[in-house]
């Protein structure tokens, strides 16, 4: 009975739908990046098969038309995948930061009873307009703390995660103050 108590909560549906919609949008924005990673793995597989078929690889005759065709195909897949990864990351990161305030907005709107999934996502985009780079810089400043968590096998997370989340909450509160002054 207690294991299903979460689903009885009146906020569950709004929370679930909002977070699902956020993840779905971010998935769509990450498709070029994922396609680039797929092609990168495929080009790696092609290179491995080539080396298996040509054990004399370092001294292979590059004037052979078959080998030349393979190298051109490999280069196309490899550089195409790198291009897709770079472009995909450039597309994904601004969208990631546009939706970075969704969870905090959700907490605020659930408390007053006006949480709607699409509205919460739109509000997050509005709040972050012009402030995505500042949030990116904040995340870069917190990167050493994540590294410390990693090298301590998660033990340091007990004291570091509250610091990281506090910084993100202070950023959100400051963002609300700035946007309220502008409106």
Regions found by a protein language model. Give the residues of each.
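Hydrophobic alpha-helical membrane segments
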Residues: 1-183
């Amino acid at each position: 009975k207690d294991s299903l108590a979460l689903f009885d909560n009146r906020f569950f549906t709004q929370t679930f739908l909002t977070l699902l919609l956020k993840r779905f949008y971010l998935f769509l924005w990450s498709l070029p990046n994922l396609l680039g990673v797929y092609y990168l793995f495929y080009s790696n597989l092609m290179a491995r098969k080539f080396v298996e078929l040509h054990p004399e690889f370092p001294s292979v005759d590059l004037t052979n038309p078959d080998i030349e065709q393979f190298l051109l195909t490999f280069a196309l897949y490899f550089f195409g995948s790198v291009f897709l990864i770079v472009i995909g990351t450039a597309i994904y990161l601004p969208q990631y930061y546009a939706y970075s305030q969704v969870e905090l907005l959700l907490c605020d709107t659930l408390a007053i009873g006006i949480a709607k999934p699409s509205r919460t996502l739109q509000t997050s985009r509005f709040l972050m307009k012009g402030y995505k780079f500042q949030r990116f810089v904040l995340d870069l400043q917190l990167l050493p703390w994540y590294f410390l968590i990693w090298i301590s096998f998660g033990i340091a997370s007990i004291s570091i995660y509250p610091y990281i989340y506090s910084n993100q909450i202070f950023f959100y509160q400051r963002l609300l103050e700035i946007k309220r002054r502008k409106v």
